[in-house]
């Protein structure tokens, strides 16, 4: 019996050291050396203060800001601990109510509703934490944001274009706009104006 226990203990200790200590230490060192910004949460700073992460959406509801996708985390929007699949099915009456409420909020904020509303402005993402919207959703909001900030529409459109990221490697994903980065660029442009 003793001859069976010793190898089990040795294997347990070795595997614990390799998978619990060595492997995480090597990956952490690699991440810090090769991708330090990403390994530390892709934090965005302004005037030396962290204002958010490029990977987690934030709640913007003032008309002078671009709005991101709906957060599906409740009761606190963009709560990373509450992330998860949350979109309602297409036949669920609650989805229609949420979409109508979001369209009403867009209308109340002064958005021109004569054009079709991009779907990512009225539905939540699967995680409920998306930091990005489509260029169409950003373009849809340009007039409202420009009016609220008393900036030229062309100035706001240029900021949207400057903050639009294309497909990764030219083929993966879709073009997108990081809402936090765009809103920070808007604040900086208005301060300089």
From Swiss-Prot:
Q: How does it sit in the membrane?
A: Single-pass membrane protein
Q: Which Pfam families match?
A: KdpC
Gene Ontology MF terms: ATP binding; P-type potassium transmembrane transporter activity
Q: Where are the transmembrane segments?
A: 7-27
- Whether Ion transport counts among this entry's keywords is yes
Instruction: State a GO cellular component annotated for this protein.
Output: plasma membrane
Where in the cell? Cell inner membrane
What keywords sit in the KW lines? ATP-binding, Cell inner membrane, Cell membrane, Ion transport, Membrane, Nucleotide-binding, Potassium, Potassium transport, Transmembrane, Transmembrane helix, Transport
HAMAP family assigned:
KdpC
Q: What does this protein do?
A: Part of the high-affinity ATP-driven potassium transport (or Kdp) system, which catalyzes the hydrolysis of ATP coupled with the electrogenic transport of potassium into the cytoplasm. This subunit acts as a catalytic chaperone that increases the ATP-binding affinity of the ATP-hydrolyzing subunit KdpB by the formation of a transient KdpB/KdpC/ATP ternary complex.
- Family (UniProt): Belongs to the KdpC family.
User: What does the subunit comment say?
Assistant: The system is composed of three essential subunits: KdpA, KdpB and KdpC.
| Protein name, UniProt field | Potassium-transporting ATPase KdpC subunit
- Specify the species: Burkholderia multivorans (strain ATCC 17616 / 249)
Q: Which gene encodes it?
A: kdpC
